[in-house]
Amino acid sequence: MRGVSSWVSSAPILVLGGLAAGAAAVEEQKRADCPTFWTTTIFMPTTVYVTAPEALMSSNIVSRPSSVIGSPTGSSSRSVVSSTSSSASQRITLTTSLTAVGPSTADSASGSVTASLTVTLSTFTSAVEEPTSTQVPIKDPITSSVTSGIFPSSVTSGAPGIPTIRRPSPPPIFSGYKNAIYFTNWGTSGNSSYQPQELPVSELTHILYAFADIDANGTVKSSDAFADVGKRYARDDPHNRTRGHNAYGVVKQLYLHKKRNRNLKTLLSIGGFDYSPKFVPVAADEARRRVFATSAVKLMADYGFDGIDLDWEYPADAEQGQHFVLLLKACREALDRFSFQHRIPYRFLITVASPAGPVNSHKLDLAGMDTYVDIWNLMAYDYTGSWDNTTGHQSNLYRSPRHPSATKLSTDNAVRYYEGLGIPPNKILLGVPTYGRSFESTSGLGQAYAGVGAEGGGVLLYKTLPRPGARELWDEDAKAPWSYDNTTRELVSYDTPRSTLFKARYVRRKRLGGAFFWEARGDRAGAASLVNTMSKSLGWLDQSPNHLWYPMSQYDNIRRGMPGP
């Protein structure tokens, strides 16, 4: 139930955005015959977010003449653009001048919210501890004027109902392409081990650390505590002489990367193929969804990450697809509550590893999920493998009329399907594999084969390809390469800098959000690097800042911002 105490009155007004010294003037006007008003006038370009109580939004939004008290210092023109309401939220959008007025009585003060620009007000949908409202930015290229009045005490419980301008979802402003990569905890040991210091962070915008595990009660937990926070790297304290409870391992290295690269974000990836069955009972139960969301946010904050990634492979039917929506909703609410409670003006991210093939994507309520998802990591690979009867391309951009049985799926078809359901293209990252899939005893593309080989179940790292003796070939229609050895009769489908270049062009042409790679261990260094090729081809990488302040982390060195070695 949304009560009258469902909004905050601890601060009369909070303006987000950089304000130069002397750019704001606050004037308290006290009169014996009228209410008290606080006025903030900003004489510079700014973005302002306004949230008002539901009681006000439901019945007390009016357009007032500019002559009334509390009118804006800017333009006095006004016109209602649209008005919508629902059980979840109520919004009213107006242009140039808006006055929101509380009822005036002899013994209670009235007030107003006035903006000389386009504004959307939306209500909270729960108590203060669980804010879930969506705010839309107010923009004025010259000046913005917001007058926040003191509303009647009846609006809140025991305190004046002062509207608070809160941190919202980020505005849809393009800040550069995203170039993300998955980094695995198991990849730090064994053959072909790959350490976090080897990550090409200057070419990346996001690192997704895989994978966290899930308990039966929904608790998200580390799947390898030693790799996460226990392993000592160079310059780490080998004898634990540093005071306090500190994080080492991959977590420390990723935090250091963030400090040195302030546009680099890190995310906790949860699930993956092995842990995906654990999503099923958790997502189906409300209590366990809450546990999942709360514990995921805690682990994210403990590790000093910028968000969470959900990799559920895959919901088996439409019912599980709806459960996925509810799980994402719980996560979004938990992240927003976390930001709100800790006064953090930052939007922590939710990303989803999503399927490209129709067998799995058609079971998802993509439009419902999109409400809570910031980035879609479209897994545009594994189009073929040991489960198929014939060989084929595993990550082709287009279908090939000359090789139809080798291109049963395509990335272009997947992107068009997502777009057709209303998913914004700039939220989609195109997945690129840093591995290949092999087929043995075959005569070529679209042909039968006898096996995939014992080595890695037919999965070969890109940096080992092509195999000695194999010849690299190119499918112009599909924009996809493959290699074939006439002697061993082995075919391997994988990506190269050439195919990655075509994918980068596709990202730009379709105005997608960028690309991501699975996974870091498989790429080459230098000019043959797929990550480097994508980065250089996209050109302008995402410049949005990361977050470094985690005073709630259980690890002392992360709480302190990782001082010293």
State where each predicted segment sits.
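Surface-exposed amphipathic alpha-helices with a cationic face
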Residues: P170-I173, V250-L267, G271, V325-I344, ...
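Substrate-binding surface in catalytic domains of secreted glycosidases
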Residues: A180, T219-T242, E313-L465
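Fungal secretory targeting signals
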Residues: M1-A32
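Fungal extracellular serine/threonine-rich, low-complexity, intrinsically disordered "mucin-like" regions
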Residues: G22-S169, G539-W540
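Conserved, mostly hydrophobic/aromatic
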Residues: I207, L268, L310, C331, ...
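Short, acidic/polar
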Residues: G187-S202, A284-D302, P358-M369, T411, ...
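Glycan-recognition patch characteristic of GH18 chitinases/ENGases
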Residues: R166-M300, N532, G539-P551, G561-P565
